[in-house]
Amino acid sequence: MSRIGKKPVTVPSGVTATVDGQTVKMKGPKGQLQFLVHDDVEVKFENGQVKVAPRAETKRARSLYGTARAQIANLVEGVTKGFEKKLEITGVGYRAAMQGKNLQLALGYSHDVVYQIPEGITIAVPKPTEITITGIDPQRVGQVAAEIRAYRPPEPYKGKGVKYAGEFIFRKEGKKK
């Protein structure tokens, strides 16, 4: 049995939770999110807590209900605090700038890369070498960060490229004569 799944998710004041069949909806100060729970997982909302339990004692149901509980906890955190990812740009001439509703990246290519910011995501550029991505859905925030990083992943020799803040890049030694 999942230890994570056994704990109920407490819904704080200011957040309204509704469970409609297999759909869990959370509405809070930052916005509204919903999550479709797998059929093998049972969801109940009572006394300001969302409780999750497996419908059957199968291995699949036991593994899914811990995941469902974590996803519901992310919904609560998303509509109250939101999620944030930071990226760092390293390299001579590598920089980022906001251009209207788009993110313009100079990453050493012959042209600038223009990234269209999806709905529900906010991108800020406090410095030309830092990008901050915020939103209420952790999956979308992480996906946007991964897409931006994929334009120029950090290389192991000089460490140039786009990396997550705090990410360690394994460095390699160059050729020897």
UniProtKB/Swiss-Prot annotation:
Keywords: Ribonucleoprotein, Ribosomal protein, RNA-binding, rRNA-binding. GO terms for molecular function: rRNA binding; structural constituent of ribosome. The keyword Lipoprotein does not apply. GO terms for biological process: cytoplasmic translation. One of its GO terms (cellular component) is cytosolic large ribosomal subunit. This protein binds to the 23S rRNA, and is important in its secondary structure. It is located near the subunit interface in the base of the L7/L12 stalk, and near the tRNA binding site of the peptidyltransferase center. Part of the 50S ribosomal subunit. Belongs to the universal ribosomal protein uL6 family. This is Large ribosomal subunit protein uL6. The lineage of its organism: Bacteria, Pseudomonadati, Pseudomonadota, Alphaproteobacteria, Hyphomicrobiales.
